[in-house]
């Protein structure tokens, strides 16, 4: 009877081995590798470790999603690329697209939820999100929408050549002496001087500086010590650059446990743990963190299969001893 029970147990274990090998799935319990102890293989059922936390959702909108928009009415696109309706998505400093407004006069483009410059004024919307008419706003490298440089005036026509002078006539015969002329009339009073021309209009205000760092500048960093890169891509040291919600890179920290990548100023996952840094900026060991399509740094796909292979070798050795 005892030998029959062991045979049934061996067949059940072989069946589990085939299922796990075919699907490359991790078991819901820990099987110890021990070739001398029989039924202790299944003691790991009571010591099952909890699953690792799911990574945060990947970006859904804005600069992190190719300029995509939120679908539901009333949702705002946050600076991290996620959609929602609370202050963490819609309030100033946290919203990058589909924000509730209002916006300052002269604002335009994605920085003002797609607002356009006034029509008929010849204004262009610059990369910085401001309206203007100079090349700082309208040149192709500086413009994000309504890009149209005014055409230069046509050149003046070349001067026409002077007409040919006619041949000089023969000298006339001397005229008879003129009669005595009356005294000349007195000259008219001088006309009043014309009014001065109107003053020229003031020059237009200069354009804001172009982005210097972060995702608006190809991942560039601020140069000066202590400067933070704001969500708009400019460098500075005040709260408008360094405080949470306004800082995207070179922020003073601290960062939550498990954060990594550009979302945590280039912070790495702990070494020697097999953790990968996901596109969302969190550390983990599953394919949600380590697969090439999901990983931004410390991408190590070997950690996905090696624990399963070690468990399979232990089960195989145990089955050979039992049978």
From Swiss-Prot:
Residue numbers spanned by region Extensin-like: 150-210
Residue windows of the Sequence repeats: 151-159, 160-164, 165-167, 168-172, 173-180, 181-185, 186-190, 191-192, 193-198, 200-206
Keywords: Chitin-binding, Disulfide bond, Glycoprotein, Hydroxylation, Lectin, Plant defense, Repeat, Signal
Keyword Signal attached: yes
Signal peptide feature range: 1-22
Modification comment: Heavily glycosylated with beta-arabinose on hydroxyprolines and with alpha-galactose on serines of the extensin-like domain. As no other sugars could be detected in the native lectin, it is unlikely that the three putative N-glycosylation sites are actually glycosylated.
Residue ranges of every copy of the Chitin-binding type-1 domain listed in the record: 58-101, 105-149, 210-253, 257-301
Modification 4-hydroxyproline, positions: 50-51, 53, 55, 152-159, 161-164, 166-167, 169-172, 174-180, 182-185, 187-190, 192, 194-198, 201-206, 209
Keyword Glycoprotein on entry: yes
PROSITE patterns: CHIT_BIND_I_1, CHIT_BIND_I_2
GO biological process, one term: defense response
Cross-referenced Pfam families: Chitin_bind_1 (PF00187)
Binding site for chitin: 78, 80, 82, 89, 230, 232, 234, 241
UniProt-annotated stretches for the region Disordered: 154-203
Residue span of region 10 X approximate repeats of S-P-P-P-P: 151-206
Residues carrying covalently attached carbohydrate according to the record: 50-51, 53, 55, 151-198, 200-206, 209
Function in brief: This protein might function as a defense against chitin containing pathogens. Binds to several branched or linear N-acetyllactosamine-containing glycosphingolipids and also to lactosylceramide with sphingosine and non-hydroxy fatty acids.
Similarity comment: In the central section; belongs to the extensin family.
Subunit structure: Homodimer.
Protein name: Chitin-binding lectin 1
């Amino acid at each position: 009877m005892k030998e029959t029970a062991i045979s049934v147990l061996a067949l059940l274990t072989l069946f589990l081995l085939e299922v796990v090998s075919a699907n490359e799935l991790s078991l819901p319990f820990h099987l110890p590798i021990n070739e001398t102890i029989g039924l202790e293989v299944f003691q790991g059922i009571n010591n099952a470790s909890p699953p690792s936390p799911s990574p945060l959702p990947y970006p859904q909108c804005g600069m992190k999603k190719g300029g995509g928009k939120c679908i539901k009415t009333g949702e705002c696109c946050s600076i991290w690329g996620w959609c929602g309706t609370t202050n963490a998505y819609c309030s100033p400093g946290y919203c990058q697209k589909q924000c509730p407004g209002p916006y300052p006069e002269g604002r335009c483009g994605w920085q003002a939820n797609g607002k356009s410059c006034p029509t008929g004024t010849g204004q262009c919307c610059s990369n910085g999100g401001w309206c203007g008419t100079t090349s700082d706003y309208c040149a192709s490298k500086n413009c994000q929408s309504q890009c149209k440089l005014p055409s230069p005036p046509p050149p003046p026509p070349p001067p026409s050549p002077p007409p040919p002078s006619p041949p000089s006539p023969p000298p006339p015969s001397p005229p008879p002496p003129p009669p005595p002329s009356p005294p000349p009339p007195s000259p008219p009073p001088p006309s009043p001087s014309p009014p001065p021309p109107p003053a020229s209009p003031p020059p237009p205000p200069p354009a804001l500086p172009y982005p210097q760092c972060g995702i608006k500048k190809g991942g560039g960093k601020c140069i000066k010590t202590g400067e933070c890169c704001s969500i708009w891509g400019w460098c500075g040291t005040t709260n408008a650059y360094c405080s949470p919600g306004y800082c995207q890179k070179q922020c003073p920290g601290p960062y939550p446990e498990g954060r990594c990548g550009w979302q945590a100023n280039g912070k790495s996952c702990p070494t020697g743990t097999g953790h990968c840094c996901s596109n969302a900026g969190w550390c983990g060991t599953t394919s949600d963190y380590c697969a090439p399509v999901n990983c931004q740094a410390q991408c190590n796909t070997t950690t996905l299969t090696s624990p399963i292979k070690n468990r399979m070798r232990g089960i195989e050795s145990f089955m050979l001893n039992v049978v």
